[in-house]
Amino acid sequence: MGKIIGIDLGTTNSCVAIMEGNQVKVIENSEGTRTTPSIIAYMDDNEVLVGAPAKRQSVTNPKNTLFAVKRLIGRRFEEKEVQKDIGLMPYTIVKADNGDAWVEAHGEKLAPPQVSAEVLRKMKKTAEDYLGEPVTEAVITVPAYFNDSQRQATKDAGRIAGLEVKRIINEPTAAALAFGLDKVEKGDRKIAVYDLGGGTFDVSIIEIADVDGEMQFEVLSTNGDTFLGGEDFDQRIIDYIIGEFKKEQGVDLSKDVLALQRLKEAAEKAKIELSSSQQTEINLPYITADASGPKHLNLKITRAKLEALVEDLVERTIEPCRIAIKDAGVKVSDIDDVILVGGQTRMPKVLEKVKEFFGKDPRRDVNPDEAVAVGAAIQGQVLSGDRKDVLLLDVTPLSLGIETLGGVMTKMISKNTTIPTKHAQVYSTADDNQGAVTIKVFQGEREMAAGNKLLGEFNLEGIPPAPRGVPQIEVTFDIDANGILHVGAKDKATGKENKITIKANSGLSEAEIDQMIKDAEANAAEDHKLRELADSRNQGDALVHSTKKALTEYGDKLDAGEKEAIEASLKSLEELLKDSSADKAAIDAKVEELGKVSQKLGEKMYADMQAQQAGAAGAAGAAEGAAHAGGAQQAADDVVDAEFKEVKKD
């Protein structure tokens, strides 16, 4: 069985890790960095760039460079959070046929799981390059506060990327695993994981206990906001710059997608700089132009100004902390450690707020960018059976229930229930002789069903005629370890049953997922072909260069016929390499041909090198005598074409 890799699929950055024995390894990507920007660019020639290469070209290709797609995964187009993003993103967010939020690149509609799959594929390739073997299984992390649709969509992304997702685990729980297994402190500990990432915020209260030599991680409660993160902090800076520039120059940059992309980059850079310095300068020459000529942007921002701009965002993270503490049934003073996860937690104001709420300094010995991937890799090791000393007890973040008479939300499973879990309840009909019931499944905390997230609905038909309240319909809710819901309804009188895995009216159908997997495989095969062609071209270029060089140096030692054959073959290969439509087989054949005809040339070179080495050895041994004889120069001149004279001492 191959290794199960751990992937932190982040809004802004992603990361992959594996376990080697009991040591964790966070793997560097092909660019040499341990985190990869979650940015995907679709180019004019159908090439797809992922990570740093995509980020580098984003300013010149803003409409087809997709970032922060995790904010849209598993969401409906109508949701207010999605509507808010439509006005802010340089790329187009569109409504899919099923009502989901999709994105557009080069006029083609793309599902968020399909786009996220490109990042996952890069993570998979990163692990494969390191391990030297295929990787097919992964543990992927999601924000703890992700609902069922978002979890299902993340799982779909994994499948499209060619991965069997062994488990979806919550990011704060993964960070707790990374922290807990590393620490030597004995006894039970209660920790708070404060996870402020690029697009989401989570807080989890977790108890780490040592039960008969086994580390038990029990999530007591979780809370959060899936639309609050570093991207929102960046947006505040962008809005401020746009406002200042409009006041100063009278030009509104918010309608200029090229300018917006440059502003986004500058805002992120300024935010990072202000974590370590008190002031930074944003300098963007030629940001736009009007009738009077080009306009330049130059603006100083202080840390105090930034803190004023984002104060309410930082404040918004505190209420979920309060609720999580209350739901866990603990007091703030019971928390032993506070762990910070996510790049945005490096901001001094965030640190200050967390310290103020929890009454203690957060731990600094956890890498906020890598802890989540590390935890996922540990869970992968547990699932593969290689690790037996860890038990993870996670919870469902939101209550689950069905709509009953009067539009009321009747809860079947309450939030913060340990998963996996199962719950059954008997309901009846609302009308006389009702032949079918529709089961509508919701997720959320509101009293009325309409205020919650509709996950899906299904019918149970063929109920025998009976007065209202007589039929007995047993509804079963079953949440698996991924936090994904399976629902069943059974008429106890007839034994008729209907089961579904909640896929909602939204989400991707099996047919769509299969098609996306096929497309991805076709792209991968095409990429492989292009890569092989590039390798052959490079090999051809290198051979042309080395043959030309060898001909210049040793051509006069060849027969005229040999030399002509090499030159003809060389010319033929050069012509072929200039032809952009030349295929791999043709190039390989010409490379082989040139290799054969230039064999004699290679032999001459080899013989000459041997002679030089032997000459050098002889000359070194005889240097002293050569000096006495005054024949050093003569000796050197004689070292030609495998002949040398030994100069003896007088």
From Swiss-Prot:
Modified residues (Phosphothreonine): 200
Highest taxon listed in the record's lineage: Bacteria
Induction context: By stress conditions e.g. heat shock.
GO MF term (any one): ATP binding
Keywords for the protein's UniProt record, in alphabetical order: ATP-binding, Chaperone, Nucleotide-binding, Phosphoprotein, Stress response
Cited Pfam families: HSP70 (PF00012)
Alphabetical list of Gene3D superfamilies matching this protein: 1.20.1270.10, 3.30.420.40, Actin, Chain A, domain 4, Substrate Binding Domain Of DNAk, Chain A, domain 1
CDD domains for the chain: ASKHA_NBD_HSP70_DnaK-like
InterPro entries reported in the protein's UniProt record: ATPase_NBD, Chaperone_DnaK, Heat_shock_70_CS, HSP70_C_sf, HSP70_peptide-bd_sf, Hsp_70_fam
Region (Disordered): 614-635
HAMAP family xrefs: DnaK
Family recorded in the similarity comment: Belongs to the heat shock protein 70 family.
Function: Acts as a chaperone.
Listed name of the protein: Chaperone protein DnaK
Organism per entry: Burkholderia lata (strain ATCC 17760 / DSM 23089 / LMG 22485 / NCIMB 9086 / R18194 / 383)
Underlying gene: dnaK
